[in-house]
Amino acid sequence: MQVSVENTSALERRMSITVPAERIESQVNKRLQQTAQKAKIPGFRPGKVPMSVIRQRYEADARQEAVGDVIQASFYEAVVEQKLNPAGAPSVEPKVLEKGKDLEYVATFEVFPEFTVAGFENIAVERLSADVADADLDNMLEILRKQNVRFEVADRAAQNDDQLNIDFVGKVDGEVFAGGSAKGTQLVLGSGRMIPGFEEGLVGAKAGEERVLNLTFPENYQNLDLANKAAEFTVTVNSVSEPKLPELTEEFFAQFGIKEAGLEGFRAEVRKNMERELRQAIKSKVKNQVMDGLLASNPIEVPKALLDNEVNRLRVQAVQQFGGNIKPDQLPAELFEEQAKRRVVLGLIVAEVVKQFDLKPDEDRVRELIQEMASAYQEPEQVVSWYYKNEQQLNEVRSVVLEEQVVDTVLQKASVTDKSVSYEEAVKPVEAPQAD
């Protein structure tokens, strides 16, 4: 077999391959012999059909199959011989397919970029530390109470945080617009559910009152047909209900699966959950900084095949998340290209760090992570057992741990500054990073 390789770009390779005709004919004859053993042709006993008849009937199909198999096998033999690492399936262009002649074809494909991860010392990381103070715990208890608020009808004017039951009709240019009217809608004043001015315009209203609100849709309103348009809303208030926060009782604690523990037991459980959330938030922020630093220090070209695969995967995820009748390939690729590129580049960089430093998942850390995740459930032992009985789930945890070990490896070489902050600042969500 003869092989020659041309570098047509940084990552694209054009490989010309010539396979001896004898190899093709050997595969064709093998298939014809197999066919002869089972072919049923009128006038002949099974297995006794002359090869000339078999060739006449089946050689074309046998040759097509043989050529396909030989191309596939010879391609992978060639990339191994040339020490190439394809990043996707090749595009194959046959050149010579004539019977009795050597098979010649050209395979065009991309390879994975070859690089060494560098620039660790240029990565700056701010590592936060924080504690769950009693005031943080008190705030969380108040949040939990508000999340379980009940509303009772009140015979008074509406205030912020009250829940109103309303009917409304919205018009633009004197015409009711699609989605602009509803009956029996529950609206909490101050929730920000409606456009600016709507909820504010109902403060002070009483049950049975009708108000007309003249408002303007925001410029960035999701419905572009309504963006920046003046609108008139006629609103009828059916009822006004005031919020009633639940007391910190055993009944309230039971809603969170905590029974017969009392207030102190409930506080201890909430604190434990907050501390777990705090650890995860700090770890996530450190990881994001490390990944951003690796990206900035290691610009690499991305194989288009990998980028396309990741875009398609994100399309499928989006359809699964948001539903609807849309098909994944109907979503514009441009929506996902930045995120896809970031993921692909980071995947390549992380894999190279693992290779450079010969990292393997630390099984002790794997068990610790599983136990920490399991602690959020009522039967943690069962959760731990479930992970160790499911190899796929266990391998996913191993991948997470291996990525954590990559972060630790980078931190040993990066410029790290420790900073003490409040619990609130430490758990504040990080803005989604943008691809470079």
Curated annotation (Swiss-Prot):
Compartment list: Cytoplasm
Keyword tags: Cell cycle, Cell division, Chaperone, Cytoplasm, Isomerase, Rotamase
Molecular function in Gene Ontology: peptidyl-prolyl cis-trans isomerase activity; protein folding chaperone; ribosome binding
Ranges of residues in domain PPIase FKBP-type: 161-246
EC number: 5.2.1.8
Transmembrane spans: none
Xref: Pfam families: FKBP_C, Trigger_C, Trigger_N
Functional summary from the UniProt entry: Involved in protein export. Acts as a chaperone by maintaining the newly synthesized protein in an open conformation. Functions as a peptidyl-prolyl cis-trans isomerase.
Identification of the protein by name: Trigger factor
Native source organism of the sequence: Pseudomonas fluorescens (strain ATCC BAA-477 / NRRL B-23932 / Pf-5)
Gene it is expressed from: tig
